[in-house]
């Protein structure tokens, strides 16, 4: 390929961002590199850009969200988009409208980007098949949460300088976590080594097939790791009793300094939020200004979502047809 041909290649050759699965290391690196530029832009007094001027972004969240929804809203507005937050609680969905009918209705309004979070795995891909615009998965069931994995990767890369060769332990409720799945896929693709640490009741069957090491003991699982990523107990997705009690869970799996001591001396701590202090993480560890990256993750989230919106918008046509489909 000539240099001229390379310049004609799209930054991110995908119409949608439905998951980390299917992305190449080059795709991931391109998004992270672009996000790096937005980190610096967001630290300026004038944060406003214009790459989405004239574009319409719809945020469609079927599940409650603080960080992700506000982050996408801020990202779109900083890029100059017209942003609409659709309230599902007051929409036709509450009157029995199907997801497909919702998709067809929204598509008729000619949006350019739809960001969707849904409680059912696969719902985002279904919607993407019915619309003409670009779709971004903001979390679907226990399936994927791609922008969370990207922001976690950016946070790690900016602090450690790389992803390849790092040992990352993901600890907690792996069974119900879309964050865990997306992070496993991304970290493996970028050459990191991934461990999962959890009681057997909170691990999905066949998790080893994703290329992770499995531990049931925190001391052994954290031995020599570079990054400790804690996950909350997703009680809202639990139909039965997965742990004896939250107090006992913290005793065995909650991250405190005693357990963190098994990791490398310069190991860093992450959490996608929201946190349950005293359940999966001790407050002192969560608030440690030297070792906790939790606040940095929030900052990186806006930059990553700006990068994703920017990258997808470059592939948008100037005129959108009524008939939809995914590519």
From Swiss-Prot:
Chain sites annotated for binding L-aspartate: 95, 178, 232
Matching InterPro entries: Asp/Orn_carbamoyltranf_P-bd (IPR006132), Asp/Orn_carbamoylTrfase (IPR006130), Asp/Orn_carbamoylTrfase_sf (IPR036901), Asp_carbamoyltransf (IPR002082), Asp_carbamoyltransf_Asp/Orn-bd (IPR006131)
Keyword Oxidoreductase: no
Pathway: Pyrimidine metabolism; UMP biosynthesis via de novo pathway; (S)-dihydroorotate from bicarbonate: step 2/3
UniProt entry tagged with the keyword Flavoprotein: no
Lineage: superkingdom: Bacteria
Keywords: Pyrimidine biosynthesis, Transferase
Function statement: Catalyzes the condensation of carbamoyl phosphate and aspartate to form carbamoyl aspartate and inorganic phosphate, the committed step in the de novo pyrimidine nucleotide biosynthesis pathway.
Annotated family: Belongs to the aspartate/ornithine carbamoyltransferase superfamily. ATCase family.
NCBIfam families from the UniProt entry: asp_carb_tr, PRK00856.1
Protein name (Swiss-Prot/TrEMBL): Aspartate carbamoyltransferase catalytic subunit
Organism: Parvibaculum lavamentivorans (strain DS-1 / DSM 13023 / NCIMB 13966)
Taxonomic lineage from the root: Bacteria, Pseudomonadati, Pseudomonadota, Alphaproteobacteria, Hyphomicrobiales
């Amino acid at each position: 390929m000539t240099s001229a041909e390379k310049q004609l290649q799209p930054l991110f050759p995908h119409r949608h961002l439905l998951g980390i699965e299917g992305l190449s290391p080059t795709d991931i690196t391109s998004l992270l590199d672009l996000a790096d530029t937005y980190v610096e832009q967001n630290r300026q007094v004038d944060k406003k850009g214009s790459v989405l001027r004239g574009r319409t972004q719809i945020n469609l969240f079927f599940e409650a969200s603080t960080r992700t929804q506000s982050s996408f809203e801020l990202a779109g507005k900083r890029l100059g988009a017209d942003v609409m937050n659709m309230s599902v609680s007051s929409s036709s969905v509450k009157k029995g409208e199907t997801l497909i009918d919702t998709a067809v209705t929204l598509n008729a309004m000619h949006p350019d980007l739809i960001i969707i979070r849904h409680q059912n795995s696969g719902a985002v891909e279904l919607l993407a098949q019915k619309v003409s615009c670009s779709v971004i998965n903001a979390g679907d069931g226990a399936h994927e949460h791609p922008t969370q994995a990207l922001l976690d990767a950016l946070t790690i890369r900016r602090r450690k300088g790389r992803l390849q060769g790092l040992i990352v332990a993901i600890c907690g409720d792996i069974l119900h976590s879309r964050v865990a799945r997306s992070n496993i896929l991304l970290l493996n693709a970028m050459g990191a080594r991934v461990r999962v640490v959890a009681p057997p009741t909170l691990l999905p069957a066949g998790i080893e097939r994703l290329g992770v090491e499995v531990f049931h003991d925190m001391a052994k699982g954290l031995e020599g790791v570079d990054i400790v990523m804690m996950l909350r107990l997703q009680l809202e997705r639990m139909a039965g009793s997965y742990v004896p009690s939250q107090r006992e869970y913290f005793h065995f799996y909650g991250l405190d300094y005693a357990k963190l001591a098994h990791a490398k001396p310069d190991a860093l701590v992450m959490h996608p939020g929201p946190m349950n202090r005293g359940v999966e993480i001790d407050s002192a560890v969560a608030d440690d200004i030297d070792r906790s990256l939790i606040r940095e993750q929030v900052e990186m989230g806006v930059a990553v979502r700006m990068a994703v919106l920017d990258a997808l918008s470059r592939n948008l046509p100037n005129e959108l047809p009524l008939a939809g489909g995914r590519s």
